[in-house]
Amino acid sequence: PTTTNTVDFHSAAYFLRYSNTLQVVRETDSDAKNSFAVNSFGTATAQAINNKTAFENATIDSSDGAFIGRFPGSLGNSLQVSICGSSDSDGSGVINFNAWAYKSSFDAAPGTSSYVSGLGGKNDEIHVAVIDEDGEISGTAGTVLEAYPFLSVASNAKATDGTSNYYKDVIRE
């Protein structure tokens, strides 16, 4: 605990001495919106998605916003998402894995998943890094908060354990 949350922390700690569950509720202002990244051609406007159920049920036009924060508030403004595709820089604007700033968070370059390879396809894999761009979350700017290796851009892709390997499904969880 810190001096800003010691009363709340200790109240919760004492409560948990006699119980094994505690619900924490976060209040947001009525004008709070979710952070989001807009594609270069997108026209989306900020919106409020107040809980996980609303987030999962939201229909967001992918042509407008590439990513949207799960909860409203300004903390998400510090998030950055960086994606590296399976194709090395071939003139299409895809980031070359060897020159990618977040290469050290992944074991190898993305390529072709076994699922897509089995269907005769190739180059479906991407790596996704979620970064604390401003240091508001981790305390250190540029910290990789989450690394999602070898995801697929194929919406029907499956991992070896049978679960979805589609990047939107994996990141949403």
Residue ranges and their predicted role:
Residues 1-173:
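Surface-exposed assembly/interface segments
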